[in-house]
Every structure is written in C-alpha cells, then in structure tokens.
Amino acid sequence: MNKVIREKIKQALSSAPRNGFMAELHLQSIKYADELGNITAREFCEELGLKPSYGTEFSKMRNLTTRLKAAGLVTEKI
C-alpha cells in the first residue's frame, strides 16, 4: 500500500466518531479502491493495524466500487 494513502486512511479512521468508524472504513475503501486493487484484505488490515475481520468489509466495498462508478460515482470527489 502506498505510504501516503495508508496515512490518509489512518487519519480518517482515527478522526471518525466512535459510532462512525465502520462508515468511514467503508468510505475510505471505496475512495481508494483503484489504488488498493492489488492488495489482499489481510494486507489491508495488517498495514492499518485493524482486526482481520475488517478485511471482509474492505473486500465488499472494493467490489461494490465498480457498480457505484458505473452509476456515476466519482471517487475523486469523496
């Protein structure tokens, strides 16, 4: 994972409200899906210091991004 992206995601997650952590994780996974396409969910969690169970959420959001983009989402605006 790119060091800059890793730090941006860490910052976003650490500044998310306690009840908004999962939503922020989803948002960051979608935002950087293209850049993170070559890493596994396990690697994602390890690099960010997250529990391995969050890898499932990362994978779901990365897979969902293709459909969201087809519907008009511009991830650069997130």
Residue ranges, per PLM feature:
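Short, Lys/Arg-enriched anionic-surface-contact patches
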Residues: 5-31
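Amphipathic alpha-helical segments within well-ordered protein domains
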Residues: 30-33, 45
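Internal amphipathic alpha-helical segments of the cytochrome P450 catalytic fold
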Residues: 41-42, 55
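Short alpha-helical "recognition helix" segments of helix-turn-helix
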Residues: 42-48
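Major-groove recognition helix of helix-turn-helix-like DNA-binding domains
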Residues: 52-66
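Short Lys/Arg-enriched helix C-cap and helix-to-coil transition segments
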Residues: 62-78
